[in-house]
Amino acid sequence: MFNVVLVEPEIPPNTGNVIRLCANTGARLHLIEPLGFPLDDAKMRRAGLDYHEYAQMRVHRDWDAFVAAEAPDPARMFAFTTRGSGRFHDRAFEPGDWFVFGAETRGLAPALVDRFAPEQRVRLPMRPGNRSLNLSNTVAVVVFEAWRQAGFEGGA
């Protein structure tokens, strides 16, 4: 299935929503520290309801530890950023792909975005003049589009 990577998430309910999304779609969740909250935060647990036990989640101390532990294929990693030049719906996603998202208030650090090839820097369309979409909403749109492309494999 797909991999969701949240780099330094800050808002507990967003991460809770993503946990629930991953449990319901079979996506694996990777959290890159530092986190803006403790993992037992009540707001995060409430947003994720009782789905925590069904989600596959790993926590990594930083980006380099994540890359060392998971060894993702750079060609199958996609950085979702408002500074991306490619549109997500023009991509052909494959099971096993890695979808990387930044912190709610600042997105992905420019130095991290620079590690991705330009064609791997992707954005969702928005109306002009808006800054960004909510993190958990963006993750849901991306995961469901990728899962749709995979024929909703494993879904009921």
UniProtKB/Swiss-Prot annotation:
Its main location: cytoplasm. Its EC number is 2.1.1.207. It is an enzyme of class 2 (transferase). This is tRNA (cytidine(34)-2'-O)-methyltransferase. It comes from the Bacteria. HAMAP family: tRNA_methyltr_TrmL. It catalyses: cytidine(34) in tRNA + S-adenosyl-L-methionine = 2'-O-methylcytidine(34) in tRNA + S-adenosyl-L-homocysteine + H(+); 5-carboxymethylaminomethyluridine(34) in tRNA(Leu) + S-adenosyl-L-methionine = 5-carboxymethylaminomethyl-2'-O-methyluridine(34) in tRNA(Leu) + S-adenosyl-L-homocysteine + H(+). It comes from Burkholderia pseudomallei (strain 1106a). Homodimer. It holds the Pfam family SpoU_methylase.
